[in-house]
Amino acid sequence: MRGTLATALLLVASCRIAAESNQINPQQASHHVGTTLNKLFTKSSPRRFLRDNREQRVALALTAANESRTIENAVTSAVHGITDASTTTAATRDAARDILNQHAFPKEGIRPQFDLNLPPSETSALLTGASNIPQRNHAFSSITSGIAVSSSRTSNQRTAKTQANLDMSHQGTVRKTLSKTQFKNPAASKSTKRRKKARIIPPFVVNKVDTLYREHLTAKSLEFDPTIKETEAMLKLYVESTVDPLPVSTVHFNHFRYFKDQDLTLLKEKLGTTLESALSTLAALNLPPGMLKAIERPFVWYASLARWRAMYCDFFEFLNANSNKIATSLPNVEFFGGETSSTVRDQLLATLKEEMKTRTKTRRNGKIMNDLKVVLAKYNVEEEIKAAIRGLGEQFLKRDHEIIPLQRHSRRSPASQSRSNNQRTGLTPYGLQIPGPERDSFRHIESNKHA
């Protein structure tokens, strides 16, 4: 805008000089200026009108080179340069006014109407007020708005305020680089990579192994009845050789903590009628619904953990004995070969058998008794009922050898098998057995409540 205004002011000054000289008739001035329909048409550069006025041309150049000159000063200087408006023709004045209006103020809504016939002081006041009209900020000029910039495009002089504002805008647009680089722990990276090497078992492999294992359970008269998810979990633990095998108690605990009520109901059906009878005895005490489910959960967890340990041992023994048969029945013959070593399999099986021994029961026993203690402290019930529930937990743990027999159902002698069938009719080989005196104590509590 400043360049356009400077050009318009040069045209105004040129018109004034041409009018003041009054040496050329309008007919003779057609070589330089032709006035048609109030339009100014120049056939040559405006500097030709200043050719014979060296002093005024030098003064105008010095004024344009002034670094402290603003738009208001430029407008005031141009208006005062038109000393005598009466000597100029009407066409020249109208042409200069149109150029100033169109180029200095391109928007017609904010364009002021200048009258060059007014005295210089009044015209200067109008131009100075018009220069303060607010205009739309451009995207590139919004950062440095309010900064006084020189009218000359070749100037490189800046005030302290200008330099400070430019520095602030530069800091706001430049992205800060990180001075520190965070490095991961090498041990953590190795453990993460090692954990990611867990093999993904295709569904058709899980289904085939599950079918063969069910045939094995039917032939051995074992009633584990694993689900497809349990078979997949056992198979993943078997083929995983890049990490240390987790104890079955840890795997089962992480799996059991997300069980819902319907999952517990389905699981209780696989743990035998002995556990169901014990839980039904608890239900006969008319405990609050929330307390009854909280009391059932530790018993179901312990019984299902016993089932898992026995089932894991049997499953790994089955895979070790039938690995060739399983591999040949699969499209991918090399699924069980190469990566899983016999040393890892033996270590995993030894870990499972170690968990089944009596010396590893202390931690599990403490957990079930602590869970019962937390539940009893949470609910307000009679002390006699609390004592009966604690006694049920102690008797439950003392008969751990009956809950997890080391001898499989198929390996028992006919005499022991007949005795077991007479003692526990309709029970699975890993069911729970609640002694008779304990049931009598619950009957005593129930009779006292009805009395």
Swiss-Prot record:
<comment type="function">
    <text>Secreted effector that acts as an elicitor that induces cell death in host plant cells.</text>
</comment>
<feature type="region of interest" description="Disordered">
    <location>
        <begin position="175"/>
        <end position="194"/>
    </location>
</feature>
<feature type="region of interest" description="Disordered">
    <location>
        <begin position="404"/>
        <end position="451"/>
    </location>
</feature>
<keyword id="KW-1048">Host nucleus</keyword>
<feature type="signal peptide">
    <location>
        <begin position="1"/>
        <end position="19"/>
    </location>
</feature>
<keyword id="KW-0325">Glycoprotein</keyword>
<comment type="similarity">
    <text>Belongs to the RxLR effector family.</text>
</comment>
<feature type="compositionally biased region" description="Polar residues">
    <location>
        <begin position="175"/>
        <end position="184"/>
    </location>
</feature>
<feature type="short sequence motif" description="RxLR-dEER">
    <location>
        <begin position="48"/>
        <end position="69"/>
    </location>
</feature>
<keyword id="KW-0964">Secreted</keyword>
<feature type="compositionally biased region" description="Polar residues">
    <location>
        <begin position="413"/>
        <end position="426"/>
    </location>
</feature>
<keyword id="KW-0843">Virulence</keyword>
<protein>
    <recommendedName>
        <fullName>Secreted RxLR effector protein 111</fullName>
    </recommendedName>
</protein>
<feature type="compositionally biased region" description="Basic and acidic residues">
    <location>
        <begin position="437"/>
        <end position="451"/>
    </location>
</feature>
<keyword id="KW-0732">Signal</keyword>
<dbReference type="GO" id="GO:0042025">
    <property type="term" value="C:host cell nucleus"/>
</dbReference>
<feature type="glycosylation site" description="N-linked (GlcNAc...) asparagine">
    <location>
        <position position="66"/>
    </location>
</feature>
<dbReference type="GO" id="GO:0005576">
    <property type="term" value="C:extracellular region"/>
</dbReference>
